[in-house]
Amino acid sequence: MIPSRNIQCDFVAVLVQLIQPHTHAQTSWVYFQYKIRRTLMIRIDEIYNNTFWPWFQRNRPGYRVFHCDPFGRSDPDSVVNYGSDTAHEHNYIFIYDQEPIHLNIHMETFEKVITLNADIHSNIYLNRVTGAWSKIPRANGEIPGYLLTSEHDSENVEYVCAHFDWKPAYYFFHGWAALDWYRGYDKTFLIQPIQERTITKTFIAPNRIVAGERQHRLEMLYYIFKNGMMHNHISCPDTCPAENISIHDAVKPLIAKYPDIESVFAAQSLPINFVNETDHPMHSCWLSLFDESAESLLYLVTETVATGRKHHLTEKTFKPIALGMPFVIVGTKGSLEYLRGYGFRTFGDIWDESYDSAEDSVRIERIAELLKSLDVLSTEAKQLLFNRAREVVEHNWNHFYNGGFEAVLWVELNDMLAQIDP
């Protein structure tokens, strides 16, 4: 059971009720609401030095704060830290919140953090005044170290913490990232109003990194190609830009599961690009494809992680929300339930969302069946489905852009920090 984070105490709404009677100028009141709704906005590229490190300095002096820099790297050489020249450093936290944990890749990174804190683990520290090393007995046999991730209910986090005797902590990094990256798009004229859209396609499905740990995207593309759904808005590279491997080589590890996958991909003319787009550019930190999205019944989100026991949603899930669209998520089991825990709504009253509770071995096939059942509908029927989804789409848009989601994340972040040992 996922703990509920659907907090119904939007601080913005409370402030509106308290202060509005005392505001005389309507224009001033509109501006005030605008400013208040952005008071908590975290600049995600400054979250370590402007949010976490000042909090630890003020509330948990003696902690070292580690993270990976620059964004997107997770190798041992990317580990950096903040520390104190005045306080006795007796504990530390490693904020590993940007990327999912892959045990076959990232154990060396975690070992690097242990090495950098060898003095704390041995109960020995350098007296910076005298220059002498001193041994400090640790109260109650306390073992130092926290691992802060953006993976909820994660078997990999449990393994790493058990292996290194770390304590786990969690917050939704990618929720904050999406709020920062997609802020302001509600004040543009790039996104066609929901009520004015004419639906001509079943889905939009951007694909960029498709090999290595992302091969579930190849599985999804396999079903799209095999089931004749290429007429939708789809992109697919001929070479994975991250792994630098051709798609035809990347599908070979999947032959045992899909014996005809090579021939299915060989029949496609790759790469498949969106109009006016080449080389499948990275669009993580901004919205795009506005025209294609406005024509599509739903956005097919192929998340970063789609297997294993964990909840790990990224900014990809929030693209359709910020674009004002319904969505289907190719993610881990329970991804929709996890998202609903943050106050968003999904589309179980519009189409079958039982795929969310399906096991890893069949979830992508269930999603493909859902997409095919929608794809065979008439254009008129797809428009009716989109119109039925409008209430949920508008709720999600408002929750994302009008402070509700941010308020939930802020409470979650502060509650998490309060649980860190002194």
Model feature map: region roles:
Residues V12, T23-A25:
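Short hydrophobic alpha-helical segments enriched in small aliphatic residues
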Residues L15-L18, L40:
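Leucine-biased recognition of intrinsically disordered, low-complexity hydrophobic segments
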